[in-house]
């Protein structure tokens, strides 16, 4: 039997058992005696016996994911697409507040490694990276945040970010004069996630920083090893310090 169907069947059996025992349940699972469980009083009244005692706290609540699976709730991939549609909707009917809420939801979804890997399949890399250029500071901030989350400890997404031109954009955002500190710090976070243990991204980031007047080399003149966390930290610290001076 399907796992979800099995869980729903168990819940149904527990609920039916409770009903047969003459119990009703509050929404929090606490049992409540029937109204006629106590002795009746008054002329002509007939006494009734107490309702049977039932141990336990009633049927366990059904897992929402089980119900969603059984009854056609949206998948997480569909939720990701829907969130991006809200974020990029040009209609004035979609408020800025709703866009930022959608961004929060999107970021939480791509914390899951499998969901982050779906960005390519769902064609979401391009719109996400393009939001680094958005006129709204908070939109740029959330775009950098989501990119940092998507590529953290994930070479597959690190490769896609680099291939889609995201690394130069993040370096530009992290070092851009006039950009707010919070946006620069979030772009730095995204770069930190993008370059660690992925040499191609480290090399591109170093080249972009060099173009902007900062040489990223170790003492012997060689490139920074992306697997050397101490050296990577030194590079990232340069960007963090520049962000503080914004």
Swiss-Prot record:
Residues 23-63 are annotated as: Disordered. Pfam families: Fes1. Its main location: cytoplasm. It is found in: Cytoplasm. Keywords: Cytoplasm, Repeat, Translation regulation. Residues 23-40 have a biased composition (Polar residues). It comes from the Eukaryota. ARM repeats lie at residues 48-92, 113-152, 155-196, 214-244. The keyword Cell membrane does not apply. InterPro entries: ARM-like, ARM-type_fold, Armadillo, Hsp70_NEF-Inhibitors, Nucleotide_exch_fac_Fes1. GO terms for biological process: cytoplasm protein quality control by the ubiquitin-proteasome system; regulation of translation. GO terms for molecular function: adenyl-nucleotide exchange factor activity. One of its GO terms (cellular component) is endoplasmic reticulum. Belongs to the FES1 family. Functions as a nucleotide exchange factor (NEF) for Hsp70 chaperones which accelerates the release of ADP. Required for fully efficient Hsp70-mediated folding of proteins. This is Hsp70 nucleotide exchange factor fes-1. It comes from Neurospora crassa (strain ATCC 24698 / 74-OR23-1A / CBS 708.71 / DSM 1257 / FGSC 987). The gene is fes-1.
